[in-house]
Every structure is written in C-alpha cells, then in structure tokens.
C-alpha cells in the first residue's frame, strides 16, 4: 500500500514538473482579437481605452452599473493581458473589442507612428456601429500623462468632431490627482458607492494581476470617476 501511495505521489510530482516546464499555451486565434461582430443588443454606451486595466481604473463603477461596449486599443500581443481583459469584461458583463495595436515594441513604448491612421479608421468604424447614447475615453492630459492615453483622446475627439458633434454625447475620464494632493480636493469630488468601490477593487486585483504595481500606484483614485462632458471648443 505504501509503495502504491509513493508511486502516486511520484507520478504527481512528475506531472507537475512537466506542466511547469511546458505551461498550457493559448492559441492567438482563440483570443478573439479584432472581432467586430459583437452582439450589441441592449448596448448603447461605448468606452474606448488604450490598455487593459484603464477600463476599470477610470470607469469600473460605470461598467458595473451599466451595459457597455469596451474597446481596448493595445496589448493583443500579450496573451496574459488579453485573458485578464476578457475576464474583467465577463465579470462586469461588458461586451468588448480588442484591437491588437502595440503597447511596447522592443521593450520601448510604441509611438504609434506606423499605426495611428489605422487606429483612427477602426475608431471611425466602431463609432459608426450604432447610434451611441454615450461615448467615453481618456481625457486631454492622459490622466497622469500617459502618451497612449493622450493619443487615444485625440483620435476619438477628432473622429467625433468630424462626424458626431450634433450628438452631444462625448465624455472624458475625470481629472487625475496625485496621491499627496487627493486629500486637498476630495471634498469636491463625488465618490462612487461603497458597494461599487469594493467590487471595483476586487475585480482589479483579482483579474489584472500583471498590473498590480500600476493599480497600487493609482488606487487613491479608485473612489472617483468624475467624468467630464465634452464642450465644443474645448
């Protein structure tokens, strides 16, 4: 009997070693990238973000409360980030399109010079998919200054101004404050509900595990989603 138990344990150890050495691979074809054939029934709001995690950090409470199509521009090359994003979309009941444009190239943040026009065309296509009730994206400052956030803002704003100014339905993520400044302004900021805050926090840390350090650095903003409506001429 002891010999059988020993052999079972040995087999389990060997199997574990094989799995660790050769982890399961997800085929890129299974990641559902650039799928524009999305069921948009009961979806009349669209959120456009640069990276997976921007959706929850800047608009998680809205995703929890409402039905959104979330468009993520980058990170299709990172299977871990694709799967994290899909898990978050499932957790919030959101529809999604992941466009698969580069976040980093050769270890450096991509400047989007070679894909800027393609991103613009995709955003044009997405905004034409429905008569959207609400469109939201990054603010002019890119929240804390991220260049991809700024470029996403510019692209969405440009497409909107050229085609949809009469809709009056474009919003930008709320103003970012540094952690050492938040106490000075928080009395003037509207907080999301405690229930949504707890759920938002849980989803971010449960699913966006690769971005824990980013989440830690921005967690002081999790309670605030003071989106600003776009005014023509701004």
Place the predicted regions along the sequence by residue.
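The feature marks non-catalytic terminal segments
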Residues: 6, 11-14, 166-234
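Active-site beta-strand->loop->alpha-helix modules in alpha/beta enzyme cores, enriched
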Residues: 2-166
């Amino acid at each position: 009997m002891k010999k059988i138990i020993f052999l079972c344990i040995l087999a389990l150890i060997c199997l574990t070693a094989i799995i660790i050495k050769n982890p399961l691979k997800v085929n890129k074809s299974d990641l559902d990238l650039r799928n524009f054939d999305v069921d948009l029934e009961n979806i009349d709001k669209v959120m456009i973000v640069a990276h997976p995690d921007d959706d929850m950090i800047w608009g998680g409470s809205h995703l929890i409360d409402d039905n959104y199509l979330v468009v993520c521009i980058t990170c299709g090359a990172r299977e871990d980030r694709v799967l994290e994003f899909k898990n978050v979309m499932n957790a919030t009941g959101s529809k999604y399109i992941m466009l698969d444009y580069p976040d980093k190239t050769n270890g450096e943040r991509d400047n989007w010079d070679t894909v800027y026009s393609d991103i613009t065309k995709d955003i044009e296509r997405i905004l034409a998919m429905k008569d959207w009730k609400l469109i939201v994206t990054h603010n002019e400052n890119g929240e804390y200054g991220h260049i991809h956030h700024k470029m996403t803002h510019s692209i969405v704003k440009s497409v909107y101004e050229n085609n949809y100014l009469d809709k009056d339905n474009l919003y930008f993520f709320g103003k970012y404050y540094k952690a050492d400044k938040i106490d000075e302004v928080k009395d003037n900021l509207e907080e999301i509900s405690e229930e949504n805050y707890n759920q938002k926090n849980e989803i971010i840390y449960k699913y966006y595990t690769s971005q824990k350090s980013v989440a830690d650095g921005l967690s002081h903003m999790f309670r605030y989603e003071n989106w600003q409506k776009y005014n023509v001429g701004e």
